[in-house]
Amino acid sequence: MKNIRNFCIIAHIDHGKSTLADRLLEATGTISGKASQDQLLDNMDLERERGITIKSHAIQMRYTFKGTDYVLNLIDTPGHVDFSYEVSRSIAACEGALLVIDASQGIEAQTISNLYLALEHDLTIIPVLNKIDLPGAMPEEVKDQIVDLLGCDREDIIPASAKQGIGIEDILQAIIERISPPTGLVDAPLQAMIFDSVYNSFKGVEVYFRIFNGTIKQGDQVKFVNTGKSYEADEIGVLRLGQIPQESLSAGYVGYLISGIKNAREVKVGDTITHVNNPCKEAIKGFEDVKPMVYAGIYPVESNEYEELRTAIEKLQLNDASLVWTHESSAALGIGFRCGFLGMLHMEIVQERLEREFDMTVITTVPSVQFHVIDKQGDLHEVNAPSELPDPNLIDEIQEPFIRAQIITKPEFIGNIIKLCVDKRGALQNQTYLTPERVELTFKLPLAEVVFDFFDKLKTISKGYASLDYELLGFEASKLVKLDILLNEEKIDALSAIVHRDKAYELGKKLCAKLKELLPKQMFEIPIQAAIGTKVIARETIKAMRKNVIAKCYGGDISRKRKLLEKQKKGKKRMRQIGSVEVPQEAFLAVLKLE
């Protein structure tokens, strides 16, 4: 066991984490230079294309140092804020971490939040200054930032360039010398933590785990503590480039388990694996059920594709256990699904995977967050969609989720960023200068304002120099109302939204004006109204198309003309009572893009 090292790589998006992993694999001979492709561990096309890591991955390397053979287990972590729970579980499975920082970008928000996670788990941190070969690199300044942040010596920082292969041997040496080997008892009851799972259509769910205590053998009866289900370990082994089956694995090892599990929901990241007959005393701390933050409706474009969409979502869920869904029907869009996501990036990825892997075109409705409604009896209801909101007379208060957002940026953009956050009902809580060129701003913001277009706007006003990280603070009461849109005095449920009372009037006005542009004219006039409850707060009218009925009247007799006009008016009135308005799809999509 003293020759095992478990480590992960912490970095902000684009700081070169996946490339560094590729170089380490080449240096240890795990892959030959020929067989390699870039971002080897990112095995979804989407991950390679966007250059982000979505799932956690693990791989075992062998390295000989001063005549001793060492086993190095690299556990790759996602870097995006939506996947922070997966990161925390990957970190908990390690004893050390490489903190990779881009020499041209410096320290970013995500780097700091993941670093704090690593320090909470008492990991040994090895700072690596990456991309020193870039013309825009500022190695000395960034070294100062790292020293300020970690309180380490300048000599501890390893300069490297993953692309050129500089400094790779130094990193491997540091992993062996600085990171402590795993501790744990081989003879104790089995205690292992799941940090990831992958769905394989032939073998079922493959579970990736790290053993803290005990030994697992092939054919053992094991159970997952939090779900309480038990399985037989059909196949266990270690992960190199492929899977290598083993007879048994003991404390300190990272491995995989296959036992024909068909449902991905039974495997929860962070759960504890133990033996059925000799269970461990307690589960590993830190397990949480991941709760979705953002909800949106997903509907098929053609209503006859409903079944196909359902199969597609079910298959996606096998690989992505954090996606939750229920059935939902809407008068305007037909039948579809209400899906819960970890955040906006997760939502985009799910949508893109549906289009890519299953060839489905879908409409997504306005994303919203979960609200808590407390009724007059004092009971709490969870509301995931505006249509679920109870009658206003029954509501005592509505609570919405608040987040603490940390934004790191350059000093010249502070004014614009504060203005953006205040417009989004945020409050500035703290402002610290990390270096003269980098400021950390802490805001308290309602999540509902952030899920929409906050990130895009933040990037725009800071010319791309701001990075964001957030965590949920909890629910607080707010003045929220349900804004309905009425067309020809009928509610259009897909356009309803739960908004803050102070913003309702402005939003209602914009929505009505936008719909007036988008809806085609009819033979009768259509009122477009925005209403809160029964009170209309904004209105636009689409004028009717009318035929000139008095064109054939020559001579001046006004009563003849009036008779024809009255007759036309009556016809229009009758039409309006029975006429219904089709809402084109562009209208729904345009509402998403309201400024």
UniProtKB/Swiss-Prot annotation:
- A GO CC term? plasma membrane
Q: Which reaction does it catalyse?
A: GTP + H2O = GDP + phosphate + H(+)
Q: Which residues form a coiled coil?
A: none
Q: Which InterPro entries match?
A: EF-4 (IPR006297), EFG_III/V (IPR035647), EFG_V-like (IPR000640), EFTu-like_2 (IPR004161), LepA_C_sf (IPR038363), LepA_CTD (IPR013842), LepA_IV (IPR035654), P-loop_NTPase (IPR027417)
Positions of transmembrane segments? none
Per UniProt, the keywords (alphabetical) are: Cell inner membrane, Cell membrane, GTP-binding, Hydrolase, Membrane, Nucleotide-binding, Protein biosynthesis
Q: How does it sit in the membrane?
A: Peripheral membrane protein
Where does the UniProt annotation locate this protein? Answer: Cell inner membrane
- EC number(s) from the headed UniProt entry: 3.6.5.n1
Q: Which residues form the tr-type G domain?
A: 2-183
One matching Pfam family, short form?
LepA_C
Q: Where does GTP bind?
A: D14, H15, G16, K17, S18, T19, N130, K131, I132, D133
Per the record, the GO terms for biological process are: positive regulation of translation
- Main localisation: membrane
CDD domains recorded? EF4_II, EF4_III, LepA, lepA_C
HAMAP family for this protein: LepA
Role description? Required for accurate and efficient protein synthesis under certain stress conditions. May act as a fidelity factor of the translation reaction, by catalyzing a one-codon backward translocation of tRNAs on improperly translocated ribosomes. Back-translocation proceeds from a post-translocation (POST) complex to a pre-translocation (PRE) complex, thus giving elongation factor G a second chance to translocate the tRNAs correctly. Binds to ribosomes in a GTP-dependent manner.
**What protein family is recorded?**
Belongs to the TRAFAC class translation factor GTPase superfamily. Classic translation factor GTPase family. LepA subfamily.
**Protein name (Swiss-Prot/TrEMBL):** Elongation factor 4
Report the source organism.
Answer: Amoebophilus asiaticus (strain 5a2)
